[in-house]
């Protein structure tokens, strides 16, 4: 048995199924590049048959990412599998992940198929997938609630047809660690050809046990692949959290006895990127990536950490990519110093044009904000990368506002529509409401505001505000992000960013689970 644990990231597929987390192709590419930089073994880039947009995203990522295996989900039918194979053609290393439900409830109520029909469809699906690649994964959907004898029969057959990874899906988060771990163990013991495949675990967090179940599947069951997402992103209560799995296995190598190839210094930057793109703010007390994950408020704890860090810290903040909240640059800093700091932070831009634009944003911020922190730089670069990839139909220019006690605030917003400046003026119940009314009065998008949130990038009254706006129109949901020391200006930028995404022609459809 190998001592390497394979990390399979499904942020771009299962994570995107979280309501409101739908991503554009460009956003998926940005995340995929970060996952590759993190040295994730397998990236499930989407569900090729679900939409033209997902197919295009998988195809593009397959051509750009060279150091990770690129995977597409496919239902157990020839049409889906062919679509996945076509999307994966540019990949250096490709995997087709096919699935069908095996629990009595799903077979009867959802599929309306007999067990024998499911057995045959699973077997033939893997056989067909093997025509395109020798890297085929099979998942029995709702595996944790399936009949054990039937599950053994199906898995033995698909391994015989050439499945190289068997993924035991706890689709509804029903499992508990000991039972789930023993399920994986029993399957490996009872299936005669189980040694011909790597067993994998895929757990949901409905009962708050996704990470515990996954680790039990590894320790008790002998699985050697874990399927997970950044920040535990996923539908309902989410999926297994990649950062928690990786750091648990690395920190407790004495217990698990496994190696992971992940560059852990990329965990926090990738977490922040996913949070920004999806609009899902990471809770402060979230393990590993939460803002308070390495904070010590107790006097006893603080005293201990000052004397010896390992008294209360079982891992180092810098090992997962946290940087010290220190002043790094100022308004007199030049382009080379800015570029050097980006390299030290592990941040890359795709072109000199993006670097120049980010530097100009930095200089503008430095004129308005006395102290520039690492977090400010990361926010600038992240927003600049997003702007470079957006179809910029609308562009923020300027904002002025007036507010007096007892009167409704008034906002005046200047923005460009396909290069031509327009001015919107409106009142509202607050300065942000007035600003949105001013923009909407000129655009008339007819969209619905689903979410408005503000996050301080650093501490202090001069901190930049990062605003997330989520809009919905005709069943389509998009997120826009804007940053600025002026919260109202950041709000205007975020609203315009969301409008640009609504205006784009991207064909996106949230995949239906596996």
From Swiss-Prot:
The keyword Manganese belongs to this UniProt entry's keyword annotation: yes
GO molecular function, one term: 2-isopropylmalate synthase activity
Residue ranges of coiled coil: none
GO CC entries: cytosol
Keyword tags: Amino-acid biosynthesis, Branched-chain amino acid biosynthesis, Cytoplasm, Leucine biosynthesis, Manganese, Metal-binding, Transferase
GO BP annotations, alphabetical order: L-leucine biosynthetic process
Gene3D superfamilies membership: 1.10.238.260, 3.30.160.270, Aldolase class I
Major subcellular site: cytoplasm
InterPro entries: 2-IPM_HCS-like (IPR050073), 2-isopropylmalate_synth_dimer (IPR013709), AIPM/Hcit_synth_CS (IPR002034), Aldolase_TIM (IPR013785), LeuA/HCS_post-cat (IPR054691), LeuA_allosteric_dom_sf (IPR036230), LeuA_bact_synth (IPR005671), PYR_CT (IPR000891)
EC number: 2.3.3.13
Taxonomy, superkingdom: Bacteria
Domain Pyruvate carboxyltransferase: 5-268
Compartments where located: Cytoplasm
Reactions the enzyme catalyzes: 3-methyl-2-oxobutanoate + acetyl-CoA + H2O = (2S)-2-isopropylmalate + CoA + H(+)
Entries under Pfam families matching the protein: HCS_D2 (PF22617), HMGL-like (PF00682), LeuA_dimer (PF08502)
Primary role: Catalyzes the condensation of the acetyl group of acetyl-CoA with 3-methyl-2-oxobutanoate (2-ketoisovalerate) to form 3-carboxy-3-hydroxy-4-methylpentanoate (2-isopropylmalate).
Name of this protein: 2-isopropylmalate synthase
Organism: Burkholderia cenocepacia (strain HI2424)
Lineage of the organism: Bacteria, Pseudomonadati, Pseudomonadota, Betaproteobacteria, Burkholderiales
Encoding gene (name): leuA
């Amino acid at each position: 048995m190998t001592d390497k644990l394979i990390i399979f990231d499904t942020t771009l597929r299962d994570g995107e199924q979280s309501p409101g987390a739908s991503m554009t192709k460009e956003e998926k590419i940005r995340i995929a590049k970060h996952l590759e930089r993190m040295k994730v073994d397998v990236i499930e880039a989407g569900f090729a048959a679900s939409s033209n947009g997902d197919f295009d995203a998988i195809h593009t990522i397959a051509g750009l990412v060279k150091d990770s295996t690129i995977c597409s989900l496919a239902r157990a039918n020839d049409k889906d599998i062919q679509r996945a194979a076509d999307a994966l053609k540019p990949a250096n290393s490709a995997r087709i992940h096919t699935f069908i439900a095996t629990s009595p409830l799903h077979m009867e109520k959802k599929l309306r198929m007999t067990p024998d029909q499911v057995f045959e469809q699973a077997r033939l699906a893997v056989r067909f997938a093997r025509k395109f690649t020798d890297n085929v994964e099979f998942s029995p959907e709702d595996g944790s609630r399936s009949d054990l004898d039937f599950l053994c029969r199906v898995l033995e057959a698909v391994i015989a047809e050439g499945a190289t990874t068997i993924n035991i899906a706890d689709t509804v988060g029903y499992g508990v660690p000991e039972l789930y771990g023993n399920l994986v163990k029993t399957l490996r013991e009872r299936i005669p050809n189980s040694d011909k495949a790597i067993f994998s675990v895929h757990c949901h967090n409905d009962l708050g046990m996704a990470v515990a179940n996954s680790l039990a599947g590894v320790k008790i069951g002998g699985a050697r692949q874990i399927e997970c997402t950044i920040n535990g992103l996923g539908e309902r209560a989410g999926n297994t959290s990649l950062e928690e799995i990786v750091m648990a296995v690395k920190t407790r190598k004495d217990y698990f006895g496994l190696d992971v190839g992940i560059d852990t210094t990329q965990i926090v930057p990738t977490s922040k990127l996913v949070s920004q793109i999806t609009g899902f703010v990471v809770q402060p007390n979230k393990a590993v990536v939460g803002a308070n994950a390495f904070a010590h408020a107790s006097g006893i704890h603080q005293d201990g950490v000052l004397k010896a860090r390992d008294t209360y810290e079982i891992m180092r903040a810098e090992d997962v990519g946290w940087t010290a909240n220190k002043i790094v640059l100022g308004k007199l800093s030049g382009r080379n110093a800015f570029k050097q700091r980006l390299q030290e932070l592990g941040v890359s831009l795709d072109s000199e044009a993006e670097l120049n634009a980010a530097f100009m944003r930095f200089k503008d911020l430095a004129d308005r904000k006395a102290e520039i922190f690492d977090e400010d730089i990361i926010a600038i670069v992240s927003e600049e990368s997003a702007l470079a990839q957006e179809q910029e139909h609308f562009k923020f220019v300027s904002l002025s506002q007036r507010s007096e006690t007892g009167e409704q605030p008034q906002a005046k917003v200047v923005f460009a529509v396909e290069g031509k400046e327009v001015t919107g003026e409106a009142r509202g119940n607050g300065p942000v409401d007035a600003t949105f009314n001013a923009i909407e009065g000129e655009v008339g998008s007819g969209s619905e505001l689903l979410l408005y949130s503000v996050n301080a990038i650093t501490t202090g009254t001069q901190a930049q505000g990062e605003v997330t706006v989520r809009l919905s129109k005709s069943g389509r949901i998009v997120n826009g992000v804007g940053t600025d020391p002026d919260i109202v200006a950041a709000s205007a930028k975020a609203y315009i960013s969301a409008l640009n995404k609504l205006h784009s022609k991207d064909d996106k459809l949230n995949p239906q689970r596996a």
